Regions:
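Conserved C-terminal portion of the radical SAM core fold
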Residues: 83-142, 158-176
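Secondary-structure boundary/capping positions in well-ordered alpha/beta enzyme cores
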Residues: 31, 57, 150, 174-175
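Short linear capping/connector segments at secondary-structure termini
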Residues: 3-6, 104, 148
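Short, hinge-like loop/turn segments at secondary-structure boundaries
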Residues: 51-53, 80, 118-120, 148-150
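Conserved SAM/AdoMet-binding glycine-rich loop
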Residues: 1-80, 87-88, 94
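Well-ordered, non-membrane alpha-helical segments in soluble/globular domains
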Residues: 16-21, 156-164
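Glycine-rich tight-turn/loop motif centered on a GG-T
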Residues: 71-82, 146-154
Length: 177
């Protein structure tokens, strides 16, 4: 599988995206695509093409949900709300395309209880696949500056593992993690 993971792999004119995807599919032994993107970088025109692509090759579209909490999404400057994620996931899944999501446990302002609360909301989404990430603070970013000025709670490794387990226990059982 060719994995278009980094950045927003649907943020370009459709003809450019088609060239990229078709070029990847032309490589020997590439049997399908996994396209990671943002929920606010999807259009009906692109979904039409992805539906056609899905009819002739293996395809997964993954969305960076990150959180279901709109306050958190604003805090981390995502530029979209949770409803945007819900819509994009539904529109993609309803076209028969395998649909994935990415969430981050431990975002600023989200404690263990908040993360666990979100599992049932994520379970209600039309997701086939879910990837769970830990919070990463990268030097030179706005989040790193914020943390240096006013540190917020970070999970210890044991707290993160316990939170993941509790989250998974509440997640819909047919979602591939």
């Amino acid at each position: 599988l060719a994995y278009f993971q980094a950045y927003s792999n649907t943020y370009a004119p459709l003809d450019v995206l088609k060239r990229r995807y078709e070029e990847a599919l032309a490589v020997d032994d590439v049997v399908g695509l996994v396209i990671g993107t943002r929920p606010d970088c999807i259009s009906t025109e692109l979904l039409d093409y992805l539906e056609e692509l899905n009819s002739r090759t293996f395809l997964i579209v993954e969305y960076g949900i990150e959180s279901v909490n709109d306050d958190t999404l604003r805090h981390i400057n995502r530029g979209h709300d949770f409803e945007c994620s819900r819509r994009a996931i539904e529109l993609t899944h309803d076209r028969g395309i395998l649909t994935g999501g990415h969430i981050i446990l431990g975002l600023p302002g989200e404690d263990r209880e908040e993360n666990i609360r979100q599992a049932s909301i994520v379970s209600d989404l039309k997701l086939d696949i879910l990837k769970i990430h830990q919070l990463q603070i990268i030097r030179g970013t706005q989040l790193a500056d914020e943390y240096m000025q006013q540190p917020f709670k970070l999970f210890t490794p044991d707290e993160y593992i316990d939170t993941c387990i509790a989250y998974l226990e509440r997640l819909r059982s047919d979602i591939i993690v």
